[in-house]
């Protein structure tokens, strides 16, 4: 059996202002928030998708880096 976590992709979120919210959303028929973090300017969060997390929502100005590239939201 192969462990999925060693193949999971990581991504980086860097807060460009105080109060950036990072929210993890669940998988399944009923998508729900299951985890929230608040970052202040300059703080960095390294995260990955898991069997429970299918999406991430970022509210506030942040730099998001993945293996596919980077984006800054406003």
From Swiss-Prot:
Q: List the disulfide bonds.
A: none
Q: Which InterPro entries match?
A: MtrB, Trp_RNA-bd_attenuator-like_dom, Trp_RNA-bd_attenuator_dom
- Keywords noted in UniProt: RNA-binding, Transcription, Transcription regulation
Does this UniProt record's set of keywords contain Glycoprotein?
Answer: no
Is RNA-binding given among the entry's keywords? yes
One MF term in the entry's GO annotations: RNA binding
GO biological process terms held by the UniProt record: DNA-templated transcription termination; regulation of DNA-templated transcription
**SUPFAM superfamilies, per this entry?**
TRAP-like (SSF51219)
Which family does the similarity line name?
Belongs to the MtrB family.
NCBIfam families reported for this sequence: PRK13251.1
Q: What exactly does this protein do?
A: Required for transcription attenuation control in the Trp operon. This trans-acting factor seems to recognize a 10 bases nucleotide sequence in the Trp leader transcript causing transcription termination. Binds the leader RNA only in presence of L-tryptophan.
Subunit text: Oligomer of 11 identical subunits arranged in doughnut-like structure.
Protein name (Swiss-Prot/TrEMBL): Transcription attenuation protein MtrB
Which organism does this sequence originate in? Oceanobacillus iheyensis (strain DSM 14371 / CIP 107618 / JCM 11309 / KCTC 3954 / HTE831)
């Amino acid at each position: 059996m192969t462990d999925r976590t060693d193949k999971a992709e990581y991504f980086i979120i860097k807060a460009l202002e105080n109060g950036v919210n990072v929210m993890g959303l669940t998988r399944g028929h009923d998508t729900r928030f299951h985890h929230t973090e608040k970052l202040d300017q300059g703080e960095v969060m390294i995260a990955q998708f898991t069997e429970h997390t299918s999406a991430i929502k970022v509210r506030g100005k942040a730099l998001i880096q993945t293996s596919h590239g980077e984006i800054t939201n406003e």
